[in-house]
């Protein structure tokens, strides 16, 4: 009984081993017999095959792709070995495709067209591409540039999303992670991995309420220093640089009152004796909405440079290039 049991167990084991071997052989056949190593294929052979299947004449096909008749004959020989099929055979009317050749004639042009599209930049970008693209822009810059930018892009990229009031550090992370496509802002340094393009250079201006006592006095640096100033906190998404740190000649009596928003600071300045120093484009927009005067400061702060910023991962993308060009064209138009 034990002997018979051992024989049955051995037979089952042998059958399982045989099935495993058959499965391994079948998998090996699929990997080595039916899945060709693409690295070993010369793409030029497929280009030659496309021409041969179209013209069905070695000489004419060679002329079409700029190769000699002997070179095309050699290519046809290699193709026959690659596909293990004659592909094209002689007849009384010339070359005619085999069934495999007919099959390839139907599929090869679309496959090569896909490859060509992948490696060739498109010269014409559909304006529908703007769908889902995101432009990050701080709130104070939105005041200055969106009235001109949005009409410009309405026809060119109608689906562009604008994300306003975003802190610069978040915008930088968003560019790297792909959540944001472009950012507009002020940056003094070149960050590694990022590209920037200058849009325009602005100068600073003061915002004071109508009837401010300082307007009746001599507008000097000393008098300017005695005024109570408003400033935008460096932690604010509206922050446009530590402007008061860049004014070494200004010995203000007191530190400025910090605000998180240009508009909030401007509203307060319109009802008090605070003076607010902002980029002139921002000052012009704000003074059109609030009872504020725009006055040049009695000293010359460093210019305020506004940049278009993007990550290196998008630098060579043709669609992204198009969008950068359109945004830059809109913001550079009418620049100061």
UniProtKB/Swiss-Prot annotation:
It comes from Rhizobium etli. It comes from the Bacteria. Disulfide bonds: none annotated. Coiled coil: none annotated. The keyword tRNA-binding does not apply. Acts in trans to stimulate nod gene expression via nodD3 and exo gene expression via SyrA. Residues 41-98 form the HTH lysR-type domain. Residues 58-77 bind DNA. The keyword Hydrolase does not apply. Keywords: Activator, DNA-binding, Nodulation, Transcription, Transcription regulation. One of its GO terms (molecular function) is DNA-binding transcription factor activity. Belongs to the LysR transcriptional regulatory family. This is HTH-type transcriptional regulator SyrM. InterPro entries: LysR-type_TF (IPR050389), LysR_subst-bd (IPR005119), SyrM_PBP2 (IPR037417), Tscrpt_reg_HTH_LysR (IPR000847), WH-like_DNA-bd_sf (IPR036388), WH_DNA-bd_sf (IPR036390).
């Amino acid at each position: 009984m034990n002997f018979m049991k051992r024989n049955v167990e051995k037979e089952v084991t042998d059958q399982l081993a045989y099935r495993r071997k058959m499965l391994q052989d079948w998998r090996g056949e699929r990997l080595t017999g039916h899945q060709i190593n693409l690295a070993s294929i010369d793409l030029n052979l497929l280009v030659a095959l496309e021409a041969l299947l179209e013209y069905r004449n070695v000489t004419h096909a060679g002329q079409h792709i700029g190769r000699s008749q002997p070179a095309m004959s050699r290519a046809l020989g290699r193709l026959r070995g690659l596909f293990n099929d004659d592909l094209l055979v002689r007849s009384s009317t010339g070359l005619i495709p085999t069934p495999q050749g007919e099959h390839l004639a139907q599929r090869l042009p679309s496959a090569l067209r896909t490859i060509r599209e992948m490696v060739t930049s498109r010269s014409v970008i559909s304006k529908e591409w703007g769908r889902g693209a995101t432009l990050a822009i701080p709130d104070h810059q939105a005041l200055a540039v969106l009235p001109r930018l949005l009409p410009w892009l309405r026809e060119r990229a109608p689906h562009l999303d604008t994300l306003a009031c975003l802190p610069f550090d978040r915008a930088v992370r968003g560019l790297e992670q792909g959540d944001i496509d472009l950012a507009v802002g002020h940056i003094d340094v070149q960050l590694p991995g990022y590209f920037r393009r200058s849009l325009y250079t602005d100068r600073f201006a003061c915002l004071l309420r109508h009837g401010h006592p300082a307007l009746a006095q001599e507008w000097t640096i000393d008098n300017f220093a005695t005024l109570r100033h408003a400033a935008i906190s460096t932690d604010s998404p509206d922050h446009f640089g530590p402007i008061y740190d860049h004014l070494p000649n200004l010995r203000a009596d007191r530190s400025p009152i910090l605000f998180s928003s240009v508009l909030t600071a401007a509203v307060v300045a319109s009802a008090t004796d605070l003076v607010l120093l902002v980029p002139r484009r921002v000052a012009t927009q704000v003074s059109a909405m609030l009872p504020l005067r725009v006055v040049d400061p009695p000293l010359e702060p460093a210019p305020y440079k506004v940049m278009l910023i993007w990550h290196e991962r998008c630098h060579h993308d043709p669609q992204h290039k198009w969008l950068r060009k359109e945004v830059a064209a809109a913001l550079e138009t009418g620049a100061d």
